[in-house]
Regions:
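N-terminal cap/lid segment of alpha/beta-hydrolase-fold proteins
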Residues: 40-81
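C-terminal catalytic histidine-bearing segment of alpha/beta-hydrolase fold enzymes
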Residues: 259-293
């Protein structure tokens, strides 16, 4: 992957003292990363505000804003009165709420809560940088200073969403994501044992760790790269279920890359090929709803 190589080159340069600039404000949430690159997170408590946007006999839709140490994070929740399970959903790059309105109603009608999290930097209401070279530059700088990277905060956002749903509805909550969002969700499910399981659609590792290893890099760049890779955590989800879905002709994330990540998961697990293109679609919705019913 060219993008992974470019980012890897930056990490090497940054380590050599190229003057990476980070935020000097101490973070309230804390983390540690072991020599094997495994991330441990202690997410700061967050307050939240929920405004009901629509409600009928089938479901209630609300806008939820988490007030975090680094700014507000927005999510949209659709749920029946008593959901039998819930899905914290991390969207793919550039995915907007508008593309999930019908999906939210469908899940709620089937008895499930669907919580769309507007990931930091994804171009929606929540500010931040999208995953890419600029974010890696910023986050690796913070990592080197012991400050909280945005990537880690995004994982905390998913954990906060899980806590809200679990406390409010006392129901199993699955970390779910499509494409890039599936990567964030895998890390969250591996770090937080209270997630009921993991559902990933059209997703894989980022490829950054492999790129650095191929270049013979060692030290902090490797630890940081490992700490953000889904493959570092997906094996830790067992004995909770791992469900993955991928299109054989996916034009964005190769089918083989999805299989490779799936191969690192423990049982119980299931890898399903679906029709379509890239990302979550109605066929995948049917599979998820049926398998979790």
């Amino acid at each position: 992957m060219r993008s992974a190589f470019v980012i890897a080159f930056f990490l090497i340069t940054c380590l050599a003292g190229a003057g990476c600039i980070g935020n000097s404000t101490p973070a309230k949430s804390t983390y540690s990363v072991g020599s094997n690159g495994v991330l441990s997170l202690s997410c700061a408590p967050e307050t939240m505000n929920e405004v009901v946007l629509f409600s009928n006999e089938t479901y209630t839709k609300s806008r939820v804003v988490f007030h975090t140490e680094s700014g507000n994070v927005t999510g949209y929740l659709a749920t029946p009165t008593v959901p039998k399970a819930a899905f914290v959903y991390a969207p793919g790059a550039g995915e907007r709420l508008a593309g999930h309105e019908e999906r939210m109603v469908r899940y709620a009608s089937a008895g499930f809560a669907f919580f769309f999290i507007d990931t930091r930097g994804n171009g929606g209401e929540t500010p931040g940088l999208p995953f890419g070279q600029q974010l890696i530059q910023q986050d690796f700088s913070k990592f080197g200073k012991g400050e909280m990277p945005q990537y880690y905060l995004s994982i905390c956002d998913l954990v906060s969403a899980r806590k809200l749903l679990a406390e409010k509805y006392n129901t199993p909550v699955y970390a779910t994501g499509s494409s890039n969002g599936g990567r964030y969700a895998a890390v969250a499910a591996g770090i937080d044992p209270e997630f009921a399981g993991y559902i990933g659609i059209s997703t894989s590792d980022w490829g950054l760790l492999d790129s650095l290893n191929e270049q013979g890099v060692s030290g902090d760049p490797i630890r940081f790269a490992a700490s953000i890779e889904p493959g570092t955590y997906i094996g830790k989800i067992s004995p909770r279920p791992v469900l993955m879905y991928h299109n054989a002709t996916d034009p964005i994330i190769p089918f083989a890359s999805g299989e490779q990540l799936f191969g690192k998961a423990g049982a119980p697990k299931n890898f399903t090929e679906f029709s379509g293109d890239h990302g979550i679609n109605p066929e995948v919705d049917t599979l998820i709803i049926t398998q979790r019913a």
